[in-house]
Structure formats: C-alpha cells, structure tokens
C-alpha cells in the first residue's frame, strides 16, 4: 500500500475515533458532599465514589455557594471542603481516572445562607459578575477541577393548586390574564443578566480550558430565565432537573407522579410537569440535542396518606397530609432513598410487620410513561399511611433509552449518595447507576 493510502487510512481512522468519543453518551454523576457526613448506612465514603466512577463520564461535586455581600463563589461547608480537604480528596482521583471530568457545582438548592443571593448576583452589574467569575475560576483551578456547573437558585413556579375539575378551567383562564402565575416581575431583565453572566463566565473559563455546564433546577421556569439560543454556544452541556415536579412540600394536600416521562392527563394536571415537555422546550429553542442531559433522581418523594385518601392508591391521591416521616437512613421528611424504598417492598423480613414498617403495595407502570408508585393505606386510626412516587432501575433504564432514542447528550443522575450504594436491596451496589449506564452503552 502506498504512503498516501496509509496516510488517508490513518486520517480516516482518527476522524472515526474522534466521532465515536464525541458521540459517547454522558452519564453525569452528581455527588452531594453532605452524604459523607451522614451517619450509619447512609454515610458515603471516598471509596464509594471510586466504585461509582467506573460508570460515570463526569463527576459533579455539590455544592459551593455565593457570598451575598461580595458575590464571590465560596465553600458553604468550609470544615468539610477545606479543613478536612474533601475537595482535594475527590479531585485527587483524577490521576486514576483521567478520562472522567470533575466539575464543581454552585447553588443546587444547597446554598441556604441567604434567600435571594442569586438574584442579587444577577443584579450586581459588571463589577459583581466579575467578582463571581474570578472567584469561581480561582476556586475551580485551585482544587484541580475540570470545570464549573452553574445550578442557579432562581424563583420557582408556584405549585399546582388543589381544586375541583369544575372550576379548574376558569381558574386557569383567570390566572393567565391576571398574572397569578408570575413569581418574578423582573424575569425578562434577569434573563438578560443570566445571559451576560454565562457568556462572560464561559469566556473566562475557556481561557484555562475549563468546562461550563448549566443545571436547570426543578420547577424553575426555563422560558423566564434562560435565553436558550443565546447561551447554548457558551455551554458544554445542560442538565435538566426533570424530576420533583410535585413534592409533598410544594403539594402537601395531594400526591401524584413526581417525575413522569410524558404528560399524565386529567385531574387538574399541568402539561409541563413531565420530562418530555421540558426536553422539547430546549430543543424548540434550537439547542443541540447532544448538549441536553435529562435528570433522573435516585430517591422518591413521599406523602402521608390519611383515611380520607382512600385505599386504592391511584393518583391523584387526595387529602394527603404533607411529607411522610423521614427514613432511618436519609433522615429527611418527604424523601426516601432507593435502598429505603426497596426495603419497604414485600419481602420475607417485613411480611408480618405492622405500623410504619409494614410493607407497601407496589404499582408498576407497564407503559413506562409516568413512573411507578407504591403505597400503604392509612389504618383504622388514620395512621401509617404512605404514598411514594419514585424511579427504580427499570424506569431509570427506560429514561436512558429515551435519551438514546432522542439522540440527547445523555443522563444526569441526582445523586450518587441516594442510590443503593451498599447493595442492601439485591446485593448489587449502585443499581440505579448501573441500569442507566448499561442502557446508554
């Protein structure tokens, strides 16, 4: 074979290899560093992170915050991040996993020191933006991250109101014209400020070959705050928070699917409370599909059922009484991690249990459109009622298939610490993560 033919073949193979690498789906693994401070079976260690890394393309460390006084990005847990050197411990794994990109996320609903510091940051002008950008770049570089994830804590949509079907049409009509849906009268101004911040931040990071991703948190109206066509070129990828559409904190009086793939019609449901709507919104704004990662949660949302909630469990479940009690591991009202949910499914160890440890009835969605749920009707005293909306390895796998079928960038998993990382349920560690990864291959 002539030298020119060898050269042509080599170039063709190089192009093909580059295409294959670029076309590999993302599996962006969010890591809530607070998991390392939990106790008992819920404590998540560096060793656990390392086991998960074999399945991830990116690891996102959560979370940093914003100083409300000077708008600099800062640690919100200095004892863990800096004094105990947890930031450095995590990024030290880059030496063993050079193919994985490590990002530091700011915001993510973890920055609770000040209620509206992110709006203040947007309104701070060029000087405030510059302080944030320079401090973010410095923090990312100091701890050897490959980039920054911007998970801005912006005003949320108002939760769905509980009312009968008879009045729902009029109420929706009235809200549309009275502006009852509006939670930020300056959203158009803030959208322009978000655009300017992202463009300037991207330019600063790119000077140091650093990545920039955007995470759209659940129930933040993308059309209010994100000028998608303008910001997409400045972002390496976008993680959509396509879960927690309904939660017991936002919707205490009725339980419903918290993370459906498609719209579940009827019963006063809102058409945008589903993965497909959110994803289509960004595509319609001319964002490349390969920049969009759909979000999947490794936990379920839990409501307390009352006697008035009935015993069918079929959503929408009325007369619920807010968040169900916290689980023994996650210790957060209205939320159970996957290991806790799995332990409540009927099994030999709970077949005779009563009260809060009694098994739940699992209802699987054969269509894979809305998600599974499980419930335990309240007893004769009105106690121990429980309703859970969740994704499991099967539905997580189905959503990963959705991402592949739509040629999306991939999946963002929220988060590693809520998966069954000890293998308590079936013996398989990280069952959610594994199921999603295998379907993305």
Swiss-Prot record:
InterPro entries recorded: Chitinase_II/V-like_cat, Chitinase_insertion_sf, Glyco_hydro18_cat, Glycoside_hydrolase_SF, Glycosyl_Hydrlase_18, IDGF
MF terms (GO), sorted A to Z: chitin binding; chitinase activity; imaginal disc growth factor receptor binding
Keyword Secreted in annotation: yes
Glycosylated residues (UniProt): 221
Domain GH18: 25-441
Disulfide bond residue pairs: 29-56, 342-425
SUPFAM superfamilies found in the cross-reference section: (Trans)glycosidases, Chitinase insertion domain
GO cellular component: extracellular region
Secretion signal span: 1-23
Region (Disordered): 310-331
Domain of life (superkingdom): Eukaryota
Localization terms from the record: Secreted
Key words of the record: Developmental protein, Disulfide bond, Glycoprotein, Secreted, Signal
PTM entry text: Glycosylated.
A GO BP annotation: carbohydrate metabolic process
PANTHER family for the chain: CHITINASE, CHITINASE-LIKE PROTEIN IDGF1-RELATED
Family classification: Belongs to the glycosyl hydrolase 18 family. IDGF subfamily.
Anything else known: Lacks the typical Glu active site in position 153 that is replaced by a Gln residue, preventing the hydrolase activity. Its precise function remains unclear.
Cited function: Cooperates with insulin-like peptides to stimulate the proliferation, polarization and motility of imaginal disk cells. May act by stabilizing the binding of insulin-like peptides to its receptor through a simultaneous interaction with both molecules to form a multiprotein signaling complex.
Protein name: Chitinase-like protein Idgf3
Origin species: Drosophila simulans
């Amino acid at each position: 074979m002539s030298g020119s033919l060898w050269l042509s073949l080599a170039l063709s193979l190089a192009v093909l290899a580059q295409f294959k690498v670029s076309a590999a789906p993302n599996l962006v693994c969010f890591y809530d560093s607070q998991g390392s401070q939990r106790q008992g079976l819920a404590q998540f260690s560096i060793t656990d992170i390392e086991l998960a890394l074999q399945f991830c393309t990116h690891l996102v460390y959560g979370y940093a915050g914003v100083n409300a006084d000077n708008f600099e990005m800062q640690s919100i847990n200095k004892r863990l991040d800096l004094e105990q050197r947890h930031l450095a411990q995590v990024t030290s794994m880059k030496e063993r996993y050079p193919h994985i990109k490590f990002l530091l996320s700011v915001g993510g609903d973890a920055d609770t020191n000040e209620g509206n510091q992110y709006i203040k940051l947007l309104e701070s002008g060029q000087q405030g933006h510059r302080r944030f950008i320079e401090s973010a770049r410095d923090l990312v570089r100091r701890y050897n991250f490959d980039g920054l994830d911007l998970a801005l804590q912006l005003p949320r949509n108002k939760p769905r109101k509980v009312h009968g079907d008879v009045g729902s049409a009029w109420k929706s009509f009235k809200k549309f014209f009275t502006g009852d849906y509006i939670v930020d009268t300056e959203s158009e101004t803030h959208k322009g400020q978000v655009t300017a911040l992202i463009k300037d931040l991207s330019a600063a990071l790119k000077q140091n070959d650093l990545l920039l991703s955007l995470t759209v948190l659940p129930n933040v109206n993308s059309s209010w705050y994100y000028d998608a066509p303008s910001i997409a070129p400045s972002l390496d990828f976008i993680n959509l928070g396509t879960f927690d559409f309904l939660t017991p904190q936002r919707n205490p009086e009725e339980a419903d699917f918290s993370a459906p793939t498609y719209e579940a019609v009827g019963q006063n449901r809102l058409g945008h409370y589903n993965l497909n709507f959110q994803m289509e919104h960004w595509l319609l704004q001319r964002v490349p599909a390969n920049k969009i990662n759909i979000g999947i949660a490794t936990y379920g949302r839990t409501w307390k059922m009352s006697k008035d909630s009935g015993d069918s469990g079929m959503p929408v479940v009325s007369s619920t009484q807010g968040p169900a009690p916290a689980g023994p591991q996650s210790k957060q009202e209205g939320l159970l991690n996957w290991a806790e949910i799995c332990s409540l499914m009927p099994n030999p160890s709970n077949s005779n249990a009563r009260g809060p440890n009694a098994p739940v009835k699992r209802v699987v969605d054969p269509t894979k459109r809305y998600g599974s749920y499980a419930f335990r009707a309240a007893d004769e005293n009105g106690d121990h009622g429980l309703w859970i909306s969740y994704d499991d390895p099967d539905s997580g796998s189905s959503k990963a298939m959705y991402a592949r079928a739509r040629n999306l960038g991939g999946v963002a998993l929220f988060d590693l610490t809520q998966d069954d990382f000890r293998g308590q349920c079936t013996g398989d560690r990280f069952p959610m993560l594994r199921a999603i990864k295998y379907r993305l291959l």
